[in-house]
Amino acid sequence: GYGVQKKSDVTGAMARVGSEELNTRPVNNAFEALQGKAAGVDITSSERPGTVGSIRIRGNRSISASSDPLYVVDGVPLSAGGIETINPRDIESIDILKDASSTAIYGSRGANGVILITTKRGKAGRLALNYSGSVTLENLKDKSPAMSASDYITWRRWAYYNSDPVNNPRGDQPNYDKDQIYFAASGDPAALANVNKGWSNGTWDGSKVTDTDWADIVTQTGITHEHTISGSGGNETAQAFFSIGYLNNQGTQKGQEYERYNFSMSVDLQVKPWFKMGGSINGSWAVQDYGYSRTGQSSGSGPVDIYSAAKAIPRFGVPYDEEGNIITNPCGSTTNVYTVIDEWNKSTDNRQTFRALGSFYGQFDFGKIWAPLEGLSYKISFGPDFRHYRQGIFISKDSAVKMGSKNYAKYATDRYLSWTLDNQINYNKTFGKHNLGVTLLQSASKYNKESGSESANAIPNENFEWYNMGSVDITDAATYGAGMSTGMSENQLASYMARINYAYNDRYLLTVSGRYDGSSVLADGHKWSFFPSAALGWRIDQEDFMKDISWINQLKLRFGLGTTGNSAVSAYSTLGNIQSFYVPFGSTLTPAYATNEPYYTSSQVKMANKDLGWEKTTQYNYGVDFSFLNGRISGSMDIYHSNTNDLLLSMTIPTLTGFNSTYANVGKTKNFGVDLSLNLVPIQTKDFEWSSTINAAYQKDEILELANGKQDDISNAWFIGESINVFYGTASDGLWQESDAAEMAKFNANGHKFEAGMVKPVDQDGNYIIDSNDRIILGNKNPKWVLGWSNTFNYKGLELGIELNGRFGYMVDTGGEGQYGMYNQREISYWTPDNTGADYQKPIYSTAGGDAYSSLLGFKDASFIKIRNISLGYNFNSKALKNIGISSLKLYAQAKNIGNLYSSVDFMDLDLGTTYYNRGFTFGLQVGF
């Protein structure tokens, strides 16, 4: 950051992903392109069009403050959102700064790593035009389908039997009269009639029951097409680049779609030999149809998407009654189970985002004005970032979730405006064997956000959607339930930075930097702090004693240390808010205002902390870069450890203060890890080459202190000596069996009601009582190892690529299987007297819940290796193409998300954290003129 260095002179830990690697496969955003390409960078995916996953660089260091990295696009730090709005084909390179010696120059904003995005710029030469485009067809693949209608009916029979075996037959002994009770209780005559089809011949035949594939109703073949046209050219004094892009991503779930338009332009002008100026603009307009919305439902705990809503409906339910009317609540009164027929047209969540990001600079080279000042330059740069976001939600009264009550609408907007102004002085000079670089920086930035939201029920006309909120009477709360809110937030950051880069004889390297940051979000007297860093490098390959070792091309040792800060709390965390409300005065309501003290407000508020300061991380990094056998083997390895102090935590305080909690600088964590990047060329002949890249990372974090010193915070599952994110609860030891009768009796004597087929919790203290004293740390939510592996095979223009990624050594909570007998159920192996080796407990019909410990079986050890992409392309011979005016041409086909080579949980896609994923095939074209 803030300058350019030769790779051989870099002393910090960083990784670079170039445009060629980024474009090995077409992606919707740069997050997808980065996955598995850089050691120490863990990226989760999202299949919803227009939605990105999350990214972590070297794990978590903070407990409650943000762990998101800083994004810098063409020198401009982004204050809102990430890089999802940027066209990946406009990106020249992505540099990831990982250690404190690299990120400390960004001060407070670099605590969680820095991602530098450099977009493409014009190059001197003839005008070059390029087109890139692709079409992708995707289908949803479910690793955990719902039970068929027949299987579900049998399963419910078992649930009734297990709830009352005296009065109900076994599940494998069908009884017509009992079925009339089991399936009439739901209150859906059509569903009962469907069940009775199985009794049409007087004996039970489950194959005659209509099996409704609800999931198939809401899915479709998703079609994505993206196109980018770009041009570049110029001469020695002026270079320009432009790009226009279009993306349309239709989801595999009906109602989900994302459309994005991109425009990018840059100009660089050598106005005078001593003055250069330029700028770039990156604009985007995106429209996301988020899909099925649960906003405005009577319960906020409904399904997260329409596919989940469909899977919640038992398959013995049917969509229509005998008269062809849609059945709103298939299978009856089951909570939060509604039809999905045409719901994608009755539940709208439309989100629009406009973003314009600029980067403008002017640079003076004083050495060109006066020779004695050779190497001295001054650069001023200004980067504005504007983002406007609008969300419109409309749920028709005819939708299943509104149950014919009232139309619901919501309209919300967010406007973000930020800017960064940098004044930078650089001095670079070589004195014999000494190479010196000095950078001085003064930087100021400001962030402002305005937001507004309004919602109401009983919108009189569906055509209004969210565009006529004034059509409701806001004073009639009972009828319209109208609500509105507005808000504004802003913060500022001022910084001063100095850095020295020194190299002696191209062998011994030194980088020293210091940054002084002041953040407006912290308390007076604590706003400013200093963040130093230093790094050493030794290019062993340049030593005289290495000259005769021809197989070593590069060998460099690195050591770095530095301190970074984190002030990622809300803008007014150190201040008390003013609360507004209405009080009766005579016959009218009069507005009144009070501080946020709980004496005046009913809500729980935090006590203002006028001493809130910086969260600081000190990191040490030990690294080696190497290249052997003329580059056939190359890579880097880094070992790091860090300590984070003065954590920004919500701390419980005595209630005699009138408050329950406050933000404070308390607690410590530490972090240790290893990053490995290995590039191999196992085979290289005249016509054939096989290249392989492996990126692996190990990471472990640990809590050292909390708000109350060395005392655990059990309510938040924070434990001294353990990872920041763990699962804490009761362990299970499989299922109780008939042979455990004597052991069960000891527990049941203390009030438990264990039976054969139920979950067997582990009694840690051996007192035959399962309570809070039996809870333990079950596992870590974050992976210990993250892996990326890509292989490319080239033969005379034919190119085959395979990409894999994986995570290892962590735990997921799959939720277990409640098996209450009334909700839908995925296909599982459940306990019966004839299936005692089942994976899950026996079903027990209950409106209040079946087996109280069913969730314990949801905790699973997680590890996977996923085949992310297989591509086959052909690069046409450039000599033959010149005859028809084409400089380059590539055709390719790709398969996306083929499946897993290994997964410890067979019914989940552990990469996504869901039971379903999209598998697709892409056909693409790249052509240059």
List the predicted regions and their residue ranges.
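Surface-exposed loop/turn segments flanking beta-strands in extracellular/periplasmic regions
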Residues: 152-165, 184-209, 298-342, 395-409, ...
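Outer-membrane beta-barrel transmembrane strands
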Residues: 220-236, 245-247, 340-391, 411-430, ...
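Small-side-chain secondary-structure face that scaffolds active or pore-lining regions
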Residues: 251-262, 268-270, 282-284, 288-296, ...
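Flexible loop and strand-edge segments within Gram-negative outer membrane beta-barrel domains
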Residues: 140-142, 204-245, 249-256, 262-337, ...
